[in-house]
């Protein structure tokens, strides 16, 4: 695979290899055959970041080879959305011969949606001034004249200039209902939107008929908690990053959801609060004891669950675990399988043609 060529003819083979690998890893805990969810074979990534290389009068996107660290010129990127590919060409054309926008530009980040909106961030090793803003506004207007629905942001050390806004609103069809998700530049969002829809629909399927309330740790912009709200009486979700919490609050309102509460708190802190180890001002007005948590949802970072959170989640009858790293999932399952058994197992091909796998498990108390 090269940045400008995807081996689409190998898609089925690489997916089959992942299925075998996941089954092998899960064998100590379950003999289930994974439910498999396929990605589009190209144009599946909704975000991409590129370094910018200055080569005489020329200017182009590059990435670095992970093994050799050599730079690779990238003029098109079929893994990314068609909108990103259009913008890559348009941005280079707009910046190449503009001294103000070009000078000390070292990176461009792209974030797009299925609803065809984009935020493009230009990163600089220089101070950004009014002249930069004027030139950036002219570029933005020129891009919009090409029917590109784009917002531009300039970034430098301790500086962020958003010409209009630093977010876009994604609209996803999820099990017959349109969900609106505000996505903020430089905050985590699911990279593969088509796969995200399938993950949300799978999570809805495995939790249908649920009783009681849902607790979610690491909720981000509310991606899962808002979609799952229809299956539960109430949802309480935690998130530590301020921009993600703000986006989640917006998304609650935008989707007319009235049974979800988001609190800004680390998973480890929430564990302490639930165990009565310490009190938090942030929980004032929230009666934790009034919740009947029957299901806990976790979508942890690549490092998986820490040992304290492992112990905490074992207290719940059902654990829904989405993992971006099956190795740490299996490490967590060494503990969780003492009290819970695997009821459902899914493989989501979030990153085709790479070693990475995303998977989901539903665990129920033995």
Curated annotation (Swiss-Prot):
GO terms for biological process: tRNA methylation. One of its GO terms (cellular component) is cytosol. SUPFAM superfamilies: S-adenosyl-L-methionine-dependent methyltransferases. The keyword Amino-acid biosynthesis does not apply. The active site is at 324 (nucleophile), 358 (proton acceptor). Its EC number is 2.1.1.-, 2.1.1.35. It catalyses: uridine(54) in tRNA + S-adenosyl-L-methionine = 5-methyluridine(54) in tRNA + S-adenosyl-L-homocysteine + H(+); uridine(341) in tmRNA + S-adenosyl-L-methionine = 5-methyluridine(341) in tmRNA + S-adenosyl-L-homocysteine + H(+). Keywords: Methyltransferase, S-adenosyl-L-methionine, Transferase, tRNA processing. S-adenosyl-L-methionine binds at residues 190, 218, 223, 239, 299. The keyword S-adenosyl-L-methionine applies. One of its GO terms (molecular function) is tRNA (uracil(54)-C5)-methyltransferase activity, S-adenosyl methionine-dependent. It comes from the Bacteria. Gene3D superfamilies: 2.40.50.1070, Vaccinia Virus protein VP39 (3.40.50.150). Dual-specificity methyltransferase that catalyzes the formation of 5-methyluridine at position 54 (m5U54) in all tRNAs, and that of position 341 (m5U341) in tmRNA (transfer-mRNA). Belongs to the class I-like SAM-binding methyltransferase superfamily. RNA M5U methyltransferase family. TrmA subfamily. This is tRNA/tmRNA (uracil-C(5))-methyltransferase. It comes from Shigella flexneri serotype 5b (strain 8401).
């Amino acid at each position: 695979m090269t940045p400008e060529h995807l081996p689409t003819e190998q898609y089925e083979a690489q997916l089959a290899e992942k299925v075998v690998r996941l089954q092998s890893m899960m064998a100590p805990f379950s003999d289930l055959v994974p439910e498999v969810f396929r990605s589009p074979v190209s144009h599946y990534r909704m975000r991409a970041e590129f370094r910018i290389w200055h080569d005489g009068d020329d200017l182009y996107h590059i990435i670095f080879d992970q093994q050799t660290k050599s730079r690779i010129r990238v003029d098109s990127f079929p893994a990314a959305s068609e909108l990103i590919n259009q913008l890559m060409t348009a941005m280079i054309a707009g910046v190449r011969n503009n001294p103000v926008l070009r000078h000390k530009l070292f990176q461009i980040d792209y974030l797009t949606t299925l609803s065809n909106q984009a935020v493009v961030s230009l990163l600089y090793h220089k101070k950004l001034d009014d002249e930069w803003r004027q030139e950036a506004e002219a570029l933005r207007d020129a891009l919009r004249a090409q029917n590109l629905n784009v917002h531009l942001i300039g970034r430098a050390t301790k500086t962020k200039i958003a010409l209009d806004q630093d977010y876009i609103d994604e609209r996803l069809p999820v099990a017959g209902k349109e969900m609106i998700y505000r996505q903020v530049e430089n905050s985590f969002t699911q990279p593969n939107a088509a796969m995200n829809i399938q993950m949300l629909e799978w999570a809805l399927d495995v939790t249908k008929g649920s009783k009681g309330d849902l607790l979610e740790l690491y909720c981000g912009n509310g991606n899962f908690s808002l979609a799952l709200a229809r299956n539960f009486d109430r949802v309480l979700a935690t998130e530590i990053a301020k921009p993600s919490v703000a986006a989640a609050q917006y998304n609650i309102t935008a989707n007319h959801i009235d049974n979800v509460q988001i609190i800004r708190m680390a998973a480890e802190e929430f564990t302490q609060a639930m165990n009565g180890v310490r009190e938090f001002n942030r929980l004032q007005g929230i009666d934790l004891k009034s919740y009947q948590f029957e299901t806990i949802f976790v979508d942890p970072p690549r490092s998986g669950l820490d040992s304290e959170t492992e112990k905490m989640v074992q207290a719940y009858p059902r654990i829904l675990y989405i993992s971006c790293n099956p190795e740490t999932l299996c490490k967590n399952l060494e503990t969780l399988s003492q009290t819970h058994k695997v009821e459902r197992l899914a493989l989501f091909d979030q990153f085709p043609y790479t070693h990475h796998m995303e998977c989901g498990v539903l665990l129920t108390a033995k």
